[in-house]
């Protein structure tokens, strides 16, 4: 009997239009538990629109999206504490130290005492390979690779079940990009994460992704990287 996959994200009949332009027309996609799914596509195929739709930050014209069994609706409360997001630019707050950035979602979504929040923030930073020296710095004092890692630590702050990565290796040199890919694989294996990654990095697709979803002809085709 074929193995049954549990889907943590399910998209059915997604339609996104912008004026006369249709970006997605009846798009269907299922993301399996514990997999790393890479999403690729040319300019204008709607990679960012798809991600924003899943996160409830864009209101599709039609379709149904479920994440962790919950229907996602535009700007409505959802299972947000169960997912983490690494935005393309990192989106760290420039006026806070790295540790304070990581601590912020913990402070907003828990009643933990300050000292415990700080300890958890440092733990997340250690998890992504950053030490106490980096923790005390501000985002503009970090290298590009360290900034990505700090942003990833913040995305992991609430111990999510699903992690969304938007161009995680963009702007990194080849060595740093490879190290970041290795970190993603390590975190998936040790934290039981399901990861959805938008990327144009071919090495990432072949190095870490279990399946690749290609946006084409207003829809999507999913297969293993070697196909």
Task: Give each language-model segment a name.
Residues 138-142, 146:
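Conserved ABC ATPase signature
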Residues 163-166:
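Catalytic Walker B motif of ABC-type/P-loop ATPase nucleotide-binding domains
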Residues 55:
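Helix-to-loop junction immediately C-terminal to a conserved catalytic motif
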Residues 71-84, 115:
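ABC ATPase NBD coupling module
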Residues 159:
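Conserved catalytic motifs of ABC-family nucleotide-binding domains
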Residues 115-133:
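Conserved ABC ATPase "signature" region
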